Amino acid sequence: MKKILFLYFLSICCLGFSQTFVVADSLTKEPLAFATVVLDEKEMLYSNEKGVFTIQNQFEKITLTYLGYNDFVSERKLLKDTIFLNPKPFELQEVTITNNNVPLQKIGFLKRAKLLYSLPISPKTELVICIVPVEKHVNSYVETIEFPLRKIKFYNDTDKLYKNVPAVVRVNIYTVKNKLPDQKIFSSEPIKFIMSNKELIKVDISREMIQLPQEGLCFGIEMIGRVNQDGEFVEENSYAQPIFTDNESPDYTAQTYHNAFLGKDNLYDMNVSFNREISRIVKNHTYKNYNLAIGLTLRK
């Protein structure tokens, strides 16, 4: 009997494990929406619009990251209900005054591909395009980044069409090492969009003073998730659908990857899957280089 009771209470503890936390600014005490949470380098989630997140599984180590704040790393046993992130100190950079009449250089979107011209990405994943500029754009400052999104039509179990459903993405920038994304140097504020609309995700980074070096930069669009009326994330039927092109640009060469963030071999060359799928549809298909459609504004 004692053994049965022990197993009963043990099962309740295991099945009922759940911890709720709030992530907030250590100075203002304001909650931080859509912070990235990683558990034991195996599981990833986000805080909601109120900075709240709930952990359903056992874990030993937690890491929280947020734009403009120092990373927070802790063991589970040391955690409190509210996790405070410390803002990074603002560093004044040396600024060179240039001629304001220098025109901006606009790199527009390339024409979308005829077949498989978009790809839905689910929460906790990212599409990343690595760009190597031609000589005239080397060391230009990146002013704006744009990603066009295709509208998504999807249905629930009763075949009711979802409309005007909000979701959240984020734009990331990485350095390049061995032609692959390396260190993250910028992450935008979370950006809301409507999944059932054609959207243009645009980020102004003119204050960041990020230059486009000879080896290039990688630009990613990360899907955080669909948001319900309570500000909570819903992973079911939750997608962003960036546009792809199969045209070559006179301003850069590029390669696009799918990034799953966690685990080994998390980067996947999108050309492999795109060309494989098209070869099943089109006889005598000629290999093409498929990349994210991206728009950039540069300044010398």
Question: Each predicted region: which residue ranges?
Answer:
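A short, amphipathic beta-strand motif
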Residues: 19-27, 51, 83, 95
